[in-house]
């Protein structure tokens, strides 16, 4: 059995754990949003013309021909019903956009255009006048313009089954003109609700306390997600108050410990709050021992008793002098060291996910494990 296999069987990872959570400051503007002040999604159906033979095939996308006939009819062009319009330079698309809060008629917004037929490319196409509607089926903007398609590195990945850039979708910068404004109740009510981006009772209470320090008896934490502000129904007063409140610094403990794993690629993201407890987790032919380092020399004896790669005649002093522990063990308190050690051993992504799940189940991984 090779040294690598022996090393895989017993991976000894020492973790020096610490439980002090550093505080850091965030502004209220970065932690909350104002209820009712948000973007509104818009959607529309339109046609792109001017394609270089890369549009929809009429036999497989009949709705494109039907839409083209309807458009020409509205422009006064009569097309016989039995005419087969086999055009290859037209494509049916879905147009989407976001209408920002407090937008006014006449402003421009960006739009995203996506093919809904079998067009091979939208490069060089022009979007014809397309009404964009909201959830209430009212028209809020009109889109039209030349579409910009990114073809940079447009090759299929050999490792993962996806394209780095798609040519059947694109953007139109300032491609839509706002025609209708959305009403909002800002400045018309005596209360304003701040919505926390991440629900947390402690954060809600701290935000309320800091606001009341500057504006006494103004803020009330309703729940872990909402802090209510009591004010007067006046635009000037609310704008002035919010501008000051949003700049208040809030001292918060470290963020929620979380480990996010991409099941397809094996990518792992670990935030700085992840801490490990002492335990032993086994998966297949691998065993991971997570242990607190208290005495380096004593723990080297412990390491030597478990790891078959260490020569029997190798002295503890020699191991310490050669900094042996830095090669196969760590004394950090985060999960990054375990993942790095396993990656060096050639652990596959599915094996790594199994190990993390076992560590979570055993209570060794004190963090939220999210697999996407």
From Swiss-Prot:
It is found in: Bacterial flagellum basal body. GO terms for biological process: bacterial-type flagellum-dependent cell motility. Residues 1-25 form the signal peptide. It comes from the Bacteria. GO terms for molecular function: structural molecule activity. The keyword Signal applies. InterPro entries: Flag_FlgI. Its main location: other. Keywords: Bacterial flagellum, Signal. Transmembrane segments: none annotated. GO terms for cellular component: bacterial-type flagellum basal body, distal rod, P ring; outer membrane-bounded periplasmic space. The basal body constitutes a major portion of the flagellar organelle and consists of four rings (L,P,S, and M) mounted on a central rod. HAMAP family: FlgI. Belongs to the FlgI family. Assembles around the rod to form the L-ring and probably protects the motor/basal body from shearing forces during rotation. This is Flagellar P-ring protein.
């Amino acid at each position: 059995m090779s040294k690598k296999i022996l090393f895989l069987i017993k991976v000894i990872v020492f973790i020096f754990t610490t439980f002090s959570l550093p505080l850091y400051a965030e502004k209220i503007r970065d932690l909350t949003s104002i209820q009712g002040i948000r973007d509104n999604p818009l959607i529309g159906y339109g046609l792109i013309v001017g394609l270089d033979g890369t549009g929809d095939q009429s036999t497989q996308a009949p709705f494109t021909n039907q839409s083209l006939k309807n458009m020409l009819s509205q422009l006064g062009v009569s097309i016989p019903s039995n005419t087969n319009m086999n055009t290859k330079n037209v494509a049916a698309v879905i147009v989407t956009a976001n209408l920002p809060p407090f937008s006014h008629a006449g402003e421009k917004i960006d739009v995203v255009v996506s093919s809904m037929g079998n067009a091979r490319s939208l490069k060089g196409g022009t979007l014809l006048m397309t009404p964009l509607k909201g959830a209430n089926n009212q028209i809020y903007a009109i889109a039209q313009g030349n579409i910009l398609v990114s073809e940079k590195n447009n090759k299929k990945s050999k490792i993962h089954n996806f394209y780095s850039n798609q040519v059947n979708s694109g953007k139109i910068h300032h491609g839509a003109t706002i025609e209708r404004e959305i009403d909002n109740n800002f400045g018309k009510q005596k209360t304003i609700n701040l919505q926390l981006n991440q629900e947390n009772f402690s954060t809600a209470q701290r935000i309320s306390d800091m606001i009341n320090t500057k504006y006494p008896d103004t803020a009330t934490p309703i729940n872990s997600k909402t802090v209510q502000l009591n004010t007067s129904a006046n635009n000037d007063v609310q704008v002035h108050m919010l501008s000051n409140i949003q700049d208040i610094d809030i001292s918060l403990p470290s963020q929620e410990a979380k480990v996010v794993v991409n099941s397809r690629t094996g990518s792992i993201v670990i935030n700085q709050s992840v801490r490990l407890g002492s335990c032993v987790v086994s998966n297949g032919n691998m065993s991971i021992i997570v242990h607190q380092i208290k005495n380096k020399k004593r723990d080297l004896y412990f390491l030597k008793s478990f790891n078959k790669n260490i020569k029997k005649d190798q002295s503890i002093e020699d191991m310490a002098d050669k900094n042996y522990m830095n090669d196969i063990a760590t004394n950090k308190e985060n999960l990054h060291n375990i993942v790095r050690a396993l990656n060096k051993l050639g652990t596959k992504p599915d094996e790594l996910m199994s190990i993390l799940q076992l560590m979570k189940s055993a209570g060794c991984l004190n963090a939220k494990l999210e697999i996407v």
